[in-house]
Amino acid sequence: MELMLLFAKLPEAYSIFDPLVDVLPVIPVLFLALAFVWQASVGFR
């Protein structure tokens, strides 16, 4: 029973990370853009 109470409190404990979780899906897009900029700088060899 105490374990279920602990799990119920977990989302509140992690609420400070909500902005971070909102940003995380954008990171792969940034890597794609970085790869494109890198290829443009070396002239698409």
UniProtKB/Swiss-Prot annotation:
Top-level taxon in the UniProt lineage: Bacteria
Name the UniProt key words of this record, in alphabetical order: Membrane, Photosynthesis, Photosystem II, Reaction center, Thylakoid, Transmembrane, Transmembrane helix
Protein's UniProt keywords contain Membrane: yes
Q: Which residues cross the membrane?
A: 24-44
Asked if ATP-binding is a keyword of the record, the answer is no
Membrane topology term reads: Single-pass membrane protein
Q: Which GO terms describe its biological process?
A: photosynthesis
Name of a matching Pfam family: PsbK
Q: Which residues form the propeptide?
A: 1-8
- What is the annotated quaternary arrangement, including any partners? PSII is composed of 1 copy each of membrane proteins PsbA, PsbB, PsbC, PsbD, PsbE, PsbF, PsbH, PsbI, PsbJ, PsbK, PsbL, PsbM, PsbT, PsbX, PsbY, PsbZ, Psb30/Ycf12, peripheral proteins PsbO, CyanoQ (PsbQ), PsbU, PsbV and a large number of cofactors. It forms dimeric complexes.
- Family assignment? Belongs to the PsbK family.
Q: Which PANTHER family match?
A: PHOTOSYSTEM II REACTION CENTER PROTEIN K, PTHR35325
What protein is this chain from? Photosystem II reaction center protein K
Specify the species: Cyanothece sp. (strain PCC 7425 / ATCC 29141)
What's the source species' lineage?
Bacteria, Bacillati, Cyanobacteriota, Cyanophyceae, Gomontiellales
